C-alpha cells in the first residue's frame, strides 16, 4: 500500500470523506487522491515523494507557482510581527488602495477570508442596496457554498430554483432564479417577468466551475444593459478570474464594468484571503457606515495581506500576462494537435492563464454542452497523465491553471506525454 493510500484510509476515520473539500476525494475520476507534502515552482511532490507538473495550482491562487521566494519571504516577515490583530493595519490599506487602482469597477473594497464570504456578502449587500430579494445566477456557475447560491435550475426556464445540497431550505432557494449561461434571451425573459424584484445578477465572467466556458460575444454587455435598465446590481464573481486572466481581471479583458466584484485566490497569493468591492454608493451601505452587516475575525489578516501584496507586485511586471497567456495557449493548442494527430475527439480552450479540456468536438458554450463531454475518456486520460507525473484537475468539470513557473520544458513534457497517451486510445 502506498503512503497516499495509507493516508487516505486513515483520513477517512477523522475527516468526512477523508478530505476538506469534496473534489479532492477523486470521486469524479476514481482512485486514491494524491496527498501533497511539498511544492516548488511548477512542481508538487506527494507523500510517496513522486513529483508532478501541477496544473491545478491549489485551484488557481498560485499564479507564480509554488513557494515563490518573494511571497514566502513576505509571509515570513509579516508573521514575525504578529499573526493577527483583529484591528486595522497599514498593510490592509495598502492592498485596498492597490485593488481600487487596478480593478476598473472598484471604488471601495472590503477584505474577507474566503470566496464564499465574498459572494455571500456581495449578495447581501445587493439586497440591502436595492431593497429587493430575488437573485439570478447561471446553471453550472459556482459561487461558494452560501445557501442562496447552492441552487440548481427548476424544471422550466423560469421556474424557481431548487436546493442543490441537503440542508438548504427550499424557501431560501426559491428566491434564486437559475438560467442558462450565455443565454441572454433567457435573462431578458426573466427580467420581463421579475424585473422589479431582481436585486442582482451574479455571474462568472468566464465560467470556471463547469470546466471552462468563455462568454459569448454580447453576453456580458447584455447583462450590463439589463441590470442598468432595471436597477439591479451586476455582480462579477472574479474569485477565479481576478488577476488570472489579466491585470484588470475579466472585466478589463472584456471591457464591461460590473457594480460589484468578488475577488479571491490570486489576491491571497496562496493564503486565505478574498474581497468584494465596487461602486462607492453601494459599498457605503456596509456597516459601520451603512445598515448591511458584515464582519470577520480574520478579515484583513496581515500574513495573508503580505502574501497578496507580494503576488500583486509581481504580476504587474510588464508583459507578465502576455507571457502567461502565450504559455497557456501553447499547452491547449499542443494538446488539441496531439489529439487530432491520433484521431481522438478532443478540444481545448484557454482564457489568460486558465484552460479547459473537453473530450468533445468543440468547446462547450453552456452547462448542457459541458455535460455532453465524454467523462470516461477524460477519466482515463487523467489517470494516465497522473501516472506519468502530470497533475490535471481531478474532474472533467473543473478548469486548469498555468503559472508563471511553467516554462517550455514543462509544457513540452506535458505535450509529449499526452501524445503518447492519445496514441493508446
From Swiss-Prot:
What keywords were assigned to this record?
A: Cytoplasm, Isomerase, Porphyrin biosynthesis, Pyridoxal phosphate
Q: Does the keyword Cytoplasm apply?
A: yes
* Coiled-coil positions: none
Q: Which domain of life is it from?
A: Bacteria
Q: Name one Pfam family in it.
A: Aminotran_3
Any one GO molecular-function label of the UniProt entry: pyridoxal phosphate binding
Cofactor(s) required for function per UniProt: pyridoxal 5'-phosphate
What InterPro entries does the record tag this protein with?
Answer: 4pyrrol_synth_GluAld_NH2Trfase (IPR004639), Aminotrans_3 (IPR005814), Aminotrans_3_PPA_site (IPR049704), PyrdxlP-dep_Trfase (IPR015424), PyrdxlP-dep_Trfase_major (IPR015421), PyrdxlP-dep_Trfase_small (IPR015422)
Q: Report what the protein is called.
A: Glutamate-1-semialdehyde 2,1-aminomutase
Q: Which GO terms describe its biological process?
A: protoporphyrinogen IX biosynthetic process
Q: Name one GO cellular component term.
A: cytoplasm
**Known EC number:** 5.4.3.8
Q: Which PANTHER family match?
A: GLUTAMATE-1-SEMIALDEHYDE 2,1-AMINOMUTASE, GLUTAMATE-1-SEMIALDEHYDE 2,1-AMINOMUTASE 1, CHLOROPLASTIC-RELATED
Question: What is the organism field in this record?
Answer: Nitrosospira multiformis (strain ATCC 25196 / NCIMB 11849 / C 71)
Residue spans crossing the bilayer: none
Q: Does the keyword Isomerase apply?
A: yes
Name the pathway.
Porphyrin-containing compound metabolism; protoporphyrin-IX biosynthesis; 5-aminolevulinate from L-glutamyl-tRNA(Glu): step 2/2
Q: How does it assemble?
A: Homodimer.
Reactions performed catalytically: (S)-4-amino-5-oxopentanoate = 5-aminolevulinate
N6-(pyridoxal phosphate)lysine: which positions carry it? 265
Q: Where in the cell is it found?
A: Cytoplasm
Xref: CDD domains: OAT_like
Q: What is the similarity comment for this entry? A: Belongs to the class-III pyridoxal-phosphate-dependent aminotransferase family. HemL subfamily.
Amino acid at each position: 500500500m502506498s503512503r497516499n493510500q495509507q493516508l487516505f484510509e486513515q483520513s477517512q476515520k477523522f475527516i468526512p470523506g477523508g478530505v476538506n473539500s469534496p473534489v479532492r476525494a477523486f470521486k469524479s475520476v476514481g482512485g486514491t487522491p494524491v496527498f501533497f507534502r511539498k511544492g516548488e515552482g511548477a512542481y508538487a511532490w506527494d507523500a510517496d515523494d513522486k513529483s508532478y507538473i501541477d496544473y491545478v495550482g491549489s485551484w488557481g491562487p498560485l499564479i507564480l507557482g509554488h513557494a515563490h521566494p518573494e511571497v514566502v519571504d513576505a509571509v515570513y516577515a509579516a508573521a514575525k510581527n504578529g499573526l493577527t490583530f483583529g484591528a486595522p493595519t497599514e498593510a490592509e490599506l495598502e492592498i485596498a488602495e492597490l485593488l481600487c487602482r487596478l480593478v476598473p469597477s472598484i471604488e471601495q473594497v472590503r477584505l474577507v477570508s474566503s470566496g464564499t464570504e465574498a459572494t455571500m456578502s456581495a449578495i447581501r449587500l445587493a439586497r440591502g442596496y436595492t431593497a429587493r430579494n430575488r437573485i439570478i445566477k447561471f446553471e453550472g456557475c459556482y459561487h461558494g457554498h452560501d445557501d442562496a447560491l447552492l441552487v440548481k435550475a427548476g424544471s422550466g426556464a423560469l421556474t424557481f430554483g431548487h436546493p442543490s445540497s441537503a440542508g438548504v431550505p427550499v424557501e431560501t432557494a426559491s428566491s434564486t432564479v437559475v438560467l442558462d449561461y450565455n443565454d441572454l434571451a433567457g435573462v431578458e425573459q426573466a427580467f420581463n417577468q421579475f424585473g422589479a424584484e431582481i436585486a442582482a445578477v451574479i455571474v462568472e465572467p468566464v465560467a470556471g466551475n463547469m470546466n471552462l466556458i468563455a462568454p459569448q460575444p454580447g453576453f456580458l454587455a447584455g447583462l450590463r444593459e439589463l441590470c442598468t435598465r432595471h436597477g439591479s446590481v451586476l455582480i462579477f464573481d472574479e474569485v477565479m478570474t481576478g488577476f488570472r486572466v489579466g491585470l484588470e481581471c475579466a472585466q478589463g479583458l472584456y471591457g464591461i464594468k460590473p457594480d460589484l466584484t468578488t475577488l479571491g485566490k490570486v489576491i491571497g497569493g496562496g493564503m486565505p484571503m478574498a474581497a468584494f468591492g465596487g461602486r462607492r454608493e453601494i459599498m457605503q451601505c456596509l456597516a459601520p457606515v451603512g445598515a448591511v452587516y458584515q464582519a470577520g475575525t480574520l478579515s484583513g489578516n496581515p500574513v495573508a495581506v503580505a502574501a497578496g501584496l507580494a503576488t500583486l507586485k509581481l504580476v504587474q511586471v510588464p508583459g507578465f500576462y502576455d507571457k502567461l497567456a502565450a504559455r497557456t495557449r501553447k499547452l491547449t493548442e499542443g494538446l488539441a494537435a496531439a489529439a487530432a494527430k491520433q484521431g481522438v475527439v478532443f478540444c481545448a480552450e484557454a482564457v489568460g492563464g486558465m484552460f479547459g479540456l473537453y473530450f468533445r468536438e468543440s468547446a462547450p458554450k453552456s452547462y448542457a454542452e459541458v455535460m455532453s463531454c465524454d467523462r470516461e475518456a477524460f477519466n482515463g486520460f487523467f489517470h494516465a497523465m497522473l501516472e506519468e507525473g502530470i497533475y490535471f484537475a481531478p474532474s472533467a468539470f473543473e478548469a486548469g491553471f498555468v503559472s508563471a513557473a511553467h516554462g517550455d520544458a514543462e509544457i513540452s513534457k506535458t505535450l509529449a506525454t499526452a501524445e503518447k497517451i492519445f496514441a493508446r486510445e
